[in-house]
Amino acid sequence: MRTLWIMAVLLLGVEGDLMQFETLIMKIAKRSGMFWYSAYGCYCGWGGQGRPQDATDRCCFVHDCCYGKVTGCDPKLDSYTYSVENGDVVCGGNDPCKKEICECDRAAAICFRDNKVTYDNKYWRFPPQNCKEESEPC
C-alpha cells in the first residue's frame, strides 16, 4: 500500500496527461518515462531552469518549450487521441490544440529514443542547485 501511495505522489509531479505521455514513451522509446525521465538533468520532471545538461535533458527542454507554445487548452491536464499506424504514433482528433499537445509528447518520446546513448546516470536526480545558469530562450 505504501508503494501505491508513493507512486500516486510521484504522478502529481509530472506535467501533462501522465499516462498518455508515459504510454507514448513506452511505445516509441521502449522505456519507462516515469523511471528514466521524471528526475533527470535540469528539465526532465517538474519545471525546469538553467542549461540543459545533455541531449536527453534537451529533449525535456524542447518539450517544455513546446508546451509553452500551446494555447487554447491545458497541456498539463487535457487528454488527446492518437493511433499507431504501421508502427508510428499518429496524433489525431478534431481538436487542434489537443493534437498539438500530442505532437509535443510524440516529439519528446522520439527524442528520448534517438538519444538513449546520451543518457548519463550522473544526471539522474540531478541537484537543482546545479541548474543555476541562465536559461536559453525557447
From Swiss-Prot:
GO cellular component labels: extracellular region
Matches recorded under InterPro entries: PLipase_A2, PLipase_A2_Asp_AS, PLipase_A2_dom, PLipase_A2_dom_sf, PLipase_A2_His_AS
Q: What does this protein do?
A: Snake venom phospholipase A2 (PLA2) that triggers a high neuromuscular toxicity in chick biventer cervicis preparations, but not in mouse phrenic nerve-diaphragm (PND) preparations, suggesting a selective neurotoxin activity towards birds. Does not induce myotoxic, coagulant, anticoagulant, edema, and antibacterial activities. PLA2 catalyzes the calcium-dependent hydrolysis of the 2-acyl groups in 3-sn-phosphoglycerides.
- Paired cysteines (S-S): 42-131, 44-60, 59-111, 65-138, 66-104, 73-97, 91-102
Cofactor(s), names only, from the UniProt record = Ca(2+)
Pfam families in the record = Phospholip_A2_1 (PF00068)
Could you tell me how activity relates to pH for this protein? Optimum pH is 8.0.
Q: What class of enzyme is it?
A: hydrolase
What does the UniProt cofactor note say? Binds 1 Ca(2+) ion.
* Activity control: Inhibited by divalent cations different from calcium ions (cadmium, magnesium, manganese, zinc), since they act as competitive antagonists of this cofactor.
Keywords tagged on the record: Calcium, Disulfide bond, Hemostasis impairing toxin, Hydrolase, Lipid degradation, Lipid metabolism, Metal-binding, Neurotoxin, Platelet aggregation inhibiting toxin, Presynaptic neurotoxin, Secreted, Signal, Toxin
Write down what this protein is called.
Acidic phospholipase A2 AplTX-I
Which lineage do the record's taxonomy fields give for this organism?
A: Eukaryota, Metazoa, Chordata, Craniata, Vertebrata
Where would one find the signal peptide in this protein? 1-16
GO MF terms held by the record: calcium ion binding; calcium-dependent phospholipase A2 activity; phospholipid binding; toxin activity
The record's section on SMART domains has: PA2c
Keyword Secreted in the entry? The reply is yes
Q: Which family does it belong to?
A: Belongs to the phospholipase A2 family. Group II subfamily. D49 sub-subfamily.
For the biological process aspect of GO, one term held by this record is: phospholipid metabolic process
Where's the active site on this chain?
63, 105
